Amino acid sequence: MTTTSERPRATQRTAKPEGQWAKGEFDPLNPNEVFKAEDAPLNVRARILEQYAREGFDSISGTDLRGRMRWMGMYTQRKQGIDGGKTATLAPEELDDEYFMMRVRIDGGQLSREQLRVLAGISTDFARGTADITDRNNIQYHWIAIEDVPEIWRRLEAVGLDTLEACGDCTRTTLGSPVAGVHPDEVIDATPAIDFIKANYVGDPDLANLPRKFKSSIAWLPDAAPEINDISFVGVVHPDHGPGFDLQIGGGLSTKAFFALRLGAWVPLEEVPEVWLATVKLFRDHGYRRLRNRARLKYLVEDWGADKTREVLEREYLGRPLLDGPAAPTPKHTIDHVGVHRQKDGRNLVGFAPIAGRTSGAALAGVADAMEAAGSDRLRLTAYQKLVVLDVPDDAVEPLLETMRPLGFDGRPSPWRRATMACTGLEFCKLAIVETKQRAHDLVAELEERLAHLDDQLEHPIAIHLNGCPNSCARIQVADIGLKGQIITDTAGEQVPGYQVHLGGGLGEDLVVGRKLRAHKVAASELGDYVERVVTRYIAARESGESFGDWARRADEEELR
């Protein structure tokens, strides 16, 4: 007779293979792995040029259309007129429009005036005037027809730009500091490492089939969101070896947020590409390929921890130990470079805030004209949907500010315009549930009118991030006020667009995922009322020097509703 204490244990289930190549698990375990195994994604470029652009949209195969074309920076955009409530119920082909979103990768965010003019012209000629500055230094177009892609590529490549691997399971655009090479506090300009990686590894077939996307940040200043990238190199001075970079691995947001872990290693500038490449190969070989929602590097790093990750990196991929090193400094607040700031050469950099990154081809052409009038040939895009013009002489600053404002670029913005971000949203994204870009524009206008009397009482802007779905392209978990789009039931019992609220998130010194308000959602039409209510309560209840995030994390939930 078996007693309770002798009850047999349940049979332990055999762990399913995760598709880790390092373990010899090469059989594709999901549809994405199948199409990548059937034909290398980079091969789609030839079909676009030789077949699809000539024969039209209907000639595109399904696995190219919804799979491999991502490696060329292209997604089909959302068919117009389909409401967010149908996002999860319709088949992919029912959501597909016959036009594409196209993402131009701009590694380091660095552009010349000539390149900007080309980007503006493409928007006007092929994208119905659309152009969005993303939070990864890129430019995104919409309404791109397949027939126009060869000419767009020709124009981009003529000025050193491209769309290669701007999307897909590959090495995405590398974030860099928008003030690299010009900021007075910068000790090392990381641009050579970014340029080397782009020139030598992007488009390498050996690195073009990763388990999921791989995002990088390489910057001396901590102004390129290092905490939420797959790999980050952040500037730090080693007490014995001088300036170099602190290595951090395994960050990412999406539906489950992870902050990158320090490996405790210091990397000199000349070794950054080598360590970056070794990490990409580690991810390629050891990363999980069974479930798409667990295939990012962050899940492997979570399972391994920092020590094992470093040990495998050193032993299997570098063949040598890394030097131990100190942690990089962390900023107390977001560094967005908006406003007028002195460069190390005595000239000025001027940062501008379009609302949630939205602009147009005509506006970008106007920016190029304004730069030319100011004597500037260089600009940068930021990790916060902003634009920075470099090399502006003192006597050209005010004219530049005045010229840029009517173009939608404000160099002295309200705190609401300055700190509001939004993803693409329902207008064009097939994953979205609610609209975001226009909602952000309307919200900023509303807050500028309703809360202007509080602007001077805010030591730092309150970051408001709007996302059209749970995937957090607009980083809702690390915003002061993060708004995750969903369909909600309003007080009248109607299904309407709304948002789940996250409060008190942050990067830098305030590195924390925002608290989610349980059972509290806000209708899109009531966002202005909600933000006014919670900001007013913060102003009234805050302690001396207390930020919005600090207050939101300690406040009673009723105060936050």
What feature does the model see in each segment?
Residues 332-335, 340-349, 354-381, 527-561:
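Long hydrophobic segments that form regular secondary structure
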Residues 1-96, 205-208, 556-559:
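Acidic/polar, glycine-rich intrinsically disordered N-terminal extensions of enzymes
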Residues 50-110, 173-181, 214, 257-262, ...:
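Short glycine-/aliphatic-rich beta-strand segments at the starts of folded cytosolic domains
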Residues 2-29, 36, 203-311, 479-540:
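Mobile "lid/hinge" segments at catalytic clefts and subdomain interfaces of large enzymes
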Residues 2-7, 74-77, 99-244, 274, ...:
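Small-residue-enriched alpha-helical segments and adjacent helix-cap loops
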Residues 82-90, 117, 121-128, 281-284, ...:
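Short amphipathic beta-strand starts and helix->beta connectors
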Residues 129-133, 166, 204-211, 283-301, ...:
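Flexible, glycine/charged-enriched surface loops at secondary-structure junctions
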Residues 143, 147-160, 284-348, 383-384, ...:
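Terminal amphipathic helices with adjacent charged low-complexity linkers/tails
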